[in-house]
UniProtKB/Swiss-Prot annotation:
Residues 151-372 form the TRUD domain. InterPro entries: PsdUridine_synth_cat_dom_sf, PsdUridine_synth_TruD, PsdUridine_synth_TruD_CS, PsdUridine_synth_TruD_insert, TruD_catalytic. Could be responsible for synthesis of pseudouridine from uracil-13 in transfer RNAs. One of its GO terms (molecular function) is tRNA pseudouridine(13) synthase activity. The gene is truD. SUPFAM superfamilies: Pseudouridine synthase. The active site is at 81 (nucleophile). Pfam families: TruD. Belongs to the pseudouridine synthase TruD family. GO terms for biological process: tRNA pseudouridine synthesis. It catalyses: uridine(13) in tRNA = pseudouridine(13) in tRNA. It is an enzyme of class 5 (isomerase). It comes from Pyrococcus furiosus (strain ATCC 43587 / DSM 3638 / JCM 8422 / Vc1). This is Probable tRNA pseudouridine synthase D.
Length: 407
């Protein structure tokens, strides 16, 4: 399975600084920022969860188990990297004291009362990232060039596609095309990079033997096992997929949408089309205090293009790219032609997003083409560089670093 972010174009031509990230979890620190309005009403307890080497969902489940509640009773606003030190808010609407929970590499601190947290209830994240063994002398030129071009390309990072097994976008496309058996073969059968269960996956890909897979797939592959059991009951891979929780099904479709967005952005760079200047036919997103308001969009025409470009210069608007779906706002003119080309080359049509089973249907939307990190600063320590910046939700720090490091 090819790297879904490997061939994407860089915006800057300056050489990268190289180096390594995430050598140690402490090299990648993430602190979540949520709206203050969360604390204005509500009776749920809000805690800061500090974790290291834990996936968010695994940490939530372990905490829930320790206090005797179902994990769905603990709310959270966003998922965070595993190989990192992360601080995020969680909520629980029960009279329990999470500060008493003792789990290795997890700390919990009560910070007040508020409304229950849900996915998406965050403004963004502060990052402190150490890049080791780099060439810091090359940094000023790449930073200056990125500033001149309006920021960094807002690619979806590898996390969106599966870091150790980058198959989510492939599964998403096959589901969209109604090829459920092929989608199942990829999801169940493609091995990862030295992961437990890889050999069982390989055998399934070769033999398609469901009974053998059920004997050999480890118990922790619970979604895969649930699908295999459902297929055995029904003989339908479509029904087997629908046994999965809605958030998991949506990950597949979101991943394919993200893949297409990345292709659009890369193609726009390749064709020399601007990212920080609107063209007639573009859709722009309103920006308030540095935060893109992705649901507030307006179309660029010959009549308003100068006004829109003034707004972009003033930091009040950003050019957007497509998150394809059955209700997304289409570009026109040159940007619209590019959108049509990307869809055509992928072999999908917009109506496919509506023909999906209900839990997978996606209306689509728009996403800004550039990342403009706020409070951006860096410090050089010998061959290491320590970066600090804030990014709005849904934006990947690794995409900023990709442009700076170019490795």
């Amino acid at each position: 399975m090819s790297d879904p972010v490997g061939g994407l174009k860089y915006l800057t031509t300056s050489p990268g600084i190289g180096g390594k990230i995430k050598v140690y979890p402490e090299d990648f620190i993430v602190k979540e920022v949520i709206p203050k309005s969360i604390f204005k009403a509500g009776k749920c307890k809000i805690y800061i969860l500090k974790k290291k080497n834990w996936e968010t969902m695994a940490a939530i489940k372990e905490i829930a188990k320790r206090v005797g509640v179902h994990y769905s009773e603990i709310g959270f606003a966003g998922t965070k990297d595993r190989h990192a030190v992360t601080y995020q808010y969680i909520s629980i609407c029960r009279d329990v004291n999470l500060e008493e929970v003792k789990i290795r590499d997890i700390e919990l601190k009560f910070v007040g009362y508020g409304r229950p947290l849900k996915l998406g209830f965050l403004l963004g994240n502060f990052f402190k990232i150490r890049v080791r063994e780099s060439n810091p002398s090359l940094l000023p030129s790449v930073i200056e060039e990125a500033k001149e071009k309006g920021g960094f390309p807002n690619y979806f990072g590898i996390q969106r596609f599966g870091e150790k097994r980058s198959v989510n976008h492939v599964v998403g496309k096959l589901l969209l095309l109604g090829k459920y058996e092929e989608a199942a073969e990829v999801f169940l059968g493609f091995p990862g990079k030295g992961m437990e269960g890889d050999e069982a996956r390989r055998k399934f890909l070769e033999t398609k033997d469901v009974d053998l897979a059920l004997r050999e797939f480890p118990n922790f592959l619970r979604y895969e096992r649930a699908m295999l059991y459902r297929y055995k009951e029904t003989g339908s891979w479509k029904k087997a997929f629908l046994v999965l929780p809605r958030p998991i099904l949506r990950i597949f479709i979101h991943s394919f949408q993200s893949y297409l967005f990345n292709l659009y952005l890369s193609r726009r760079i390749e064709e020399g089309l601007p990212l920080n200047k609107a063209l007639p036919g573009d859709i722009v997103i309103q920006v308030k205090k540095g935060i893109p308001l992705r649901k507030r969009t307006y179309r660029v025409t010959e009549n308003n293009v100068d006004f829109v470009n003034r707004k972009i210069k003033e930091g009040e608007a950003m050019v957007s790219g497509p998150i394809f779906g059955y209700m997304y706002r289409k570009g026109k003119g040159i940007p619209g032609r590019l959108e049509e080309e990307i869809l055509e080359e992928a072999g999908v049509k917009l109506e496919y997003f509506k023909k999906l089973p209900k839990p997978m249907r996606e209306p689509g939307g728009r996403r800004e083409l550039l990342i403009r990190p706020m409070k951006f600063a860096y410090k050089v320590e010998d061959r290491d560089v320590i970066f600090r910046f804030f990014l709005p939700k849904g934006v990947y720090a690794t995409s900023v670093l990709r442009e700076i490091m170019k490795n």
